[in-house]
């Protein structure tokens, strides 16, 4: 296979399909999504067999347990995939929405219309469900998609892709609206991210190494986040009853997600009173605390086991652990907390626990991250929790989409003008 020619063909087909999708009716798009869901349910046995083949090859290759866990698809997971497609079908269609229409002194009316981006390239690792999720969101937002999944999920991704094509055909839409790259050759990624004539935006979902490579080499705009060093700051005016539940949920509900808290900041005035209880909770959960001198002194005095405590290094303040580890620092006040976050954060999600309205509003205004919260767990930074229905990923960039990227994030707006024969004087 000539990879260059193959990727060029995918690109041309996607561009042609995108023009059809841009004018496709909501009814046709929804019909395709519902038909995809039906095909996935009908092909449950085939999907499980394809996944078993992927798992056998993954174990033979000695892949780590965490990767195999992400790769594993169950009957319950397949049903959730089908339900996800149906849920996207039930979301409002953003395409064609007209907003902000204003009449100008000249007599013309000026507004904006929401339109698809065009062709979206999505690069992801060993998560077969992403194939269906990405197909659904791109289709509903009127975009064609080229999907390049991890080589570990090749067989399962191909089986899901067949269900997607079945759904598209049933609704009379081009089967090339969603194409899954059929080669594991890494050169395919290099071509996908350097085809601006065919691809309008790239969305990478995976490890930091993958995203750094794509950001460095892409000649196409990229919607991305590198990592999730999320902070929780306990203010001097925090409600004690809220502190431990928020920290517990933000850190320990799931360790491997990008919206998990990795750093805890505590105001000096309340640290001696609040840190011991937080520390006992974290130690009970098996979390290692990497602290500054002040925090370690407080935690040791509270009887926290030595094997759960460790002196923090400079690197710890910017680390995304994705593990039962958290960096802990005592800060003088809100000013130092904001400065620390804006220095070390990855720009993903930060939270303050406080009953002080002025402090809360300062935190919201001055912390430079894609999601900023007051008295809530960082784990809420999610498209579903934000009412977007579903998300393609989370962006920490400041241009175009920022934060959870749902259907609207996969669209743009163009200016539209209504006139009645007006000419410019």
From Swiss-Prot:
Q: In which pathway does it act?
A: Amino-acid biosynthesis; L-proline biosynthesis; L-glutamate 5-semialdehyde from L-glutamate: step 2/2
GO terms (molecular function) for this protein are: glutamate-5-semialdehyde dehydrogenase activity; NADP binding
Q: Which GO terms describe its biological process?
A: L-proline biosynthetic process
Which keywords describe this protein according to UniProt? Amino-acid biosynthesis, Cytoplasm, NADP, Oxidoreductase, Proline biosynthesis
Its function, per the record, reads: Catalyzes the NADPH-dependent reduction of L-glutamate 5-phosphate into L-glutamate 5-semialdehyde and phosphate. The product spontaneously undergoes cyclization to form 1-pyrroline-5-carboxylate.
Q: Name the family the entry cites.
A: Belongs to the gamma-glutamyl phosphate reductase family.
Reactions the enzyme catalyzes: L-glutamate 5-semialdehyde + phosphate + NADP(+) = L-glutamyl 5-phosphate + NADPH + H(+)
> Domain of life of the organism in this record?
Bacteria
Among its keywords, does the record have NADP?
yes
Give the primary localization class. Answer: cytoplasm
Q: Which Pfam families match?
A: Aldedh
The protein's Enzyme Commission number:
1.2.1.41
Source species taxonomy: Bacteria, Pseudomonadati, Pseudomonadota, Betaproteobacteria, Rhodocyclales
Q: Does the keyword Transmembrane apply?
A: no
Choose one Gene Ontology CC annotation of this protein and give it: cytoplasm
> Where does it reside?
Cytoplasm
Q: What protein name does the entry list?
A: Gamma-glutamyl phosphate reductase
